[in-house]
Amino acid sequence: MSDKAPVTMLDVARAAGVGVATVDRVINRRAAVRPQTAQRVLEAAERLGFRRVGLIRSRVVQDSRPRRLGFLLQSRRTPFYRSFAAGLAAAARQGEPPVECLIEHLDDLTPRHVAARLGRLAQQVDAVALVAADHPTINQAIEAVVAQHQLPVFACVSDLTTQALAGYVGVDNRKMGRMAAWLLSRLCPAASKVALLLGSHRYLCQEQCEISFRSYLREAAPQFHVLETLVSLENPQLAQNAVLELLHQHPDLAGIYVAGGGIEGVVDALRDTPQPRLVTVCHDLTDITRQALLDGTVTAVLSHPLPAMAHALCDAMRQAIDSRRSQHRLQNLLPFELYSAANV
């Protein structure tokens, strides 16, 4: 029976010319280690016959392959999500280190379908980001992914309430809603009637925009009358019908804030009406909203800074992959952009 003492982490560290903490990081992935350093640790462990050499080898192999980021976005038919997807692909290529990017678009936004697609995507990537409604089924799916795959999951565009998230990257929707209210209060006649259109109350971003919009007018322009909120379910046809009915019922309407999807339908409705042009504020600069600004159908656009948001999200996901044990929840709020016919 051999009296030789077992090889320790200290022995491996000395043979590799690194500290014990570095060997621990390679084994337990507590933090990022440069590939060259990890390879030295592996070679030293193999030479010495370290009992955990198999684990070190698997870690080195895992860490040597390109990272893959997964994104679950909404319909490709929506100009905003086409642009966001292009920005994410560019950010993945340009960042350091470059990563692979797997982007999936959803037409079916029912919570059960979103949850199922999230579960499948999580099996193919190292980190996930999604745009989703704040629904218990979706939040439970995120918690299951984090528990089963030890995978960082981020919310983007619209935050979520589950504590399992690694973070949120987007704009400050409270400020966005207040800015919309400020614009309407300055551009509409005093004591006007104004309307608000959402895609769904389930999206926290839209809920926050609505709350802050109403809050600002209540605080700074109480003479304004805000009508009951309309909901489009992110559907352009429903949005068009809702606005046409709104204009029929309220011919004295002075302004409208479109805080959700379906802007294509809203623009069509406003162009078809013989009534005087409304002060219209909506979200996100696309080919459709740019043209609507230029022809006067839309007054102002509050827009997500898509290239900056894509880079911030990819950077956050890279960092989360390399520090999986971090309990810190990232909150990255980027400033939104304001466009009118004067600066598009």
Question: How would you name each of these model-derived features?
Answer:
Residues 217, 306-344:
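Hinge/cleft segment of the Venus flytrap/periplasmic-binding protein
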Residues 94-98, 148-149, 217-224, 249-251, ...:
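Short helix-capping segments at alpha-helix termini
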Residues 1-57:
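N-terminal helix-turn-helix DNA-binding module of bacterial transcription factors
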Residues 137-175, 286-294:
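Flexible loop/hinge segments that line or gate small-molecule binding clefts
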